[in-house]
């Protein structure tokens, strides 16, 4: 049997997820029902993702917001457009402030992304389409790309 020493856990660096929530969700299905009958080929999907980080009033508390937009089109129709703002409140405990930017830009979005992905898949399926399964995102690569763009 193992015993957990809570004194040690309180001083260990860790990220705590205090809340996760939908801030905004919109799905447009503008050409239904005609577009639902025209699903003989895979639609073109245009996907955009942005991350917003807000420093909250309590020390070391941050809101990390994923903004995801997907537009599906085929030759005839704009099939659907979905926009989701999904956020989490994170507490960075006993973590050096120099490490905060990378944790907030990489680790925290990676923690909440699967939930946002599931919401988008469910909504697109409920709109009469195949569920939109967004591929996993390498938030580390996005962060490094953004940092290199800022240095240039």
UniProtKB/Swiss-Prot annotation:
Coiled coil region boundaries: none
Assigned keywords, A-Z: Chaperone, Cytoplasm, Protein transport, Translocation, Transport
Record flagged with keyword tRNA processing: no
A Gene Ontology BP annotation from the UniProt entry: protein tetramerization
Subcellular location: Cytoplasm
Signal sequence coordinates: none
InterPro entries: SecB (IPR003708), SecB-like_sf (IPR035958)
Gene3D superfamilies according to UniProt: SecB-like
CDD domains to which the protein is assigned, alphabetical: Translocase_SecB
One cellular component term from this protein's GO annotations in UniProt: cytoplasm
Chief site of localization: cytoplasm
Quaternary structure note: Homotetramer, a dimer of dimers. One homotetramer interacts with 1 SecA dimer.
Homology family: Belongs to the SecB family.
Record's function text: One of the proteins required for the normal export of preproteins out of the cell cytoplasm. It is a molecular chaperone that binds to a subset of precursor proteins, maintaining them in a translocation-competent state. It also specifically binds to its receptor SecA.
HAMAP family registered for this protein in UniProt: SecB
Stated name of the protein: Protein-export protein SecB
């Amino acid at each position: 049997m193992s015993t957990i020493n809570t004194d040690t856990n309180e001083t260990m660096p860790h990220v705590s997820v205090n809340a996760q929530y939908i801030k905004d969700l919109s799905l447009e299905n503008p050409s239904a029902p005609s577009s639902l009958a025209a699903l003989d080929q895979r639609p073109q999907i245009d996907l955009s993702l942005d991350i917003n980080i807000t420093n909250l009033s309590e020390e070391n508390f941050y809101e990390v917001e994923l903004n995801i937009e997907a537009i599906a089109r085929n030759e005839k129709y704009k099939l659907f457009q979905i926009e989701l703002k999904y956020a989490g409140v994170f507490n960075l405990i006993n973590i050096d402030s120099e490490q905060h930017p990378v944790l907030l830009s990489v680790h925290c979005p990676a923690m909440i992304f699967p939930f946002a992905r599931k919401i988008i898949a469910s909504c697109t399926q409920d709109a009469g389409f195949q569920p939109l399964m967004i591929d996993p995102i390498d938030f580390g690569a996005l962060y490094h790309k953004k940092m290199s763009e800022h240095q240039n």
